[in-house]
Amino acid sequence: MSTPRQILAAIFDMDGLLIDSEPLWDRAELDVMASLGVDISRRNELPDTLGLRIDMVVDLWYARQPWNGPSRQEVVERVIARAISLVEETRPLLPGVREAVALCKEQGLLVGLASASPLHMLEKVLTMFDLRDSFDALASAEKLPYSKPHPQVYLDCAAKLGVDPLTCVALEDSVNGMIASKAARMRSIVVPAPEAQNDPRFVLADVKLSSLTELTAKDLLG
């Protein structure tokens, strides 16, 4: 029988897990794409973009419907700026976030954030909700060659926390994020959106919850 792993750190995703920002990213993306003359009704032609870095999403659009004018990087910056302003307007903290972070601290765990969003957005969001001091390390995939589902952002966060990835539990809402955390060899907790709860791919996770309000110490530690 294998020895249970010791969990020393919990690493959270941000978009869709801490804040209900996925609809805001969608809105920002579609607003900007429509302003470029892109036919946004063809969005269903794109693969599953949940959890992907925004430059990867912009590249997918460009491959199908190239536009004239602003560079892809400029378009990425427009989408990010729009998404941040929507987050500031709506302040969409999800239920159970403060309690989940507090539970991790009560269990003596280090707490990290690993996100595809830009570092300045991570800082802004945590500060907005008075959560910055609860996080021991932040890692962004913004400047990495590959973002989720590649594990690098999780490996970077574990390194910043000073722990082995095998001693981490990752909390995610997306399949791409779950794959990234499992590729980093972490314990995996998923909290899918209601419409994704029955996605069979989430069978790869160690624990599946319908809300962070359900999180227990046993879920974290195994």
Curated annotation (Swiss-Prot):
Keywords: Carbohydrate metabolism, Cobalt, Hydrolase, Magnesium, Manganese, Metal-binding, Zinc
E.C. designation(s): 3.1.3.68, 3.1.3.22, 3.1.3.50, 3.1.3.23
One Pfam family matching this protein: Hydrolase
InterPro entries assigned to the protein according to its UniProt record, in alphabetical order: Beta-PGM-like, HAD-like_sf, HAD-SF_hydro_IA, HAD_sf, PGP-like_dom2
Residues noted as binding substrate in the record, renumbered to the chain: D13, M14, D15, S115, A116, K148
Disruption of the gene: reported phenotype: Cells lacking this gene are much more sensitive to the presence of 2-deoxyglucose in the growth medium than wild-type.
Catalytic activity of the protein: sugar phosphate + H2O = sugar + phosphate; 2-deoxy-D-glucose 6-phosphate + H2O = 2-deoxy-D-glucose + phosphate; D-mannitol 1-phosphate + H2O = D-mannitol + phosphate; D-sorbitol 6-phosphate + H2O = D-sorbitol + phosphate
Cofactor note: Requires the presence of a divalent metal cation for activity. Can use zinc, manganese, cobalt or magnesium.
Active site: residue positions: D13, D15
CDD domains: HAD_BPGM-like (cd07505)
pH dependence: Optimum pH is between 6 and 7.5.
Top-level EC class: hydrolase
Organism: Escherichia coli (strain K12)
Function summary: Sugar-phosphate phosphohydrolase that catalyzes the dephosphorylation of D-mannitol 1-phosphate and D-sorbitol 6-phosphate. Also catalyzes the dephosphorylation of 2-deoxyglucose 6-phosphate (2dGlu6P); this is a biologically important activity in vivo since it contributes to the elimination of this toxic compound and plays an important role in the resistance of E.coli to 2-deoxyglucose. To a lesser extent, is also able to dephosphorylate mannose 6-phosphate (Man6P), erythrose-4-phosphate, 2-deoxyribose-5-phosphate (2dRib5P), ribose-5-phosphate (Rib5P) and glucose-6-phosphate (Glu6P) in vitro.
Residue ranges that the Swiss-Prot or TrEMBL entry lists as coiled coil: none
Binding site residues for a divalent metal cation: D13, D15, D173
One GO CC term, this protein: cytosol
PANTHER family assigned: 6-PHOSPHOGLUCONATE PHOSPHATASE, HEXITOL PHOSPHATASE B
Family: Belongs to the HAD-like hydrolase superfamily. CbbY/CbbZ/Gph/YieH family.
Name the record gives this protein: Hexitol phosphatase B
One Gene Ontology term of the molecular function aspect: glucose-6-phosphatase activity
Cofactor entry: Mg(2+); Mn(2+); Co(2+); Zn(2+)
Gene that encodes it: hxpB
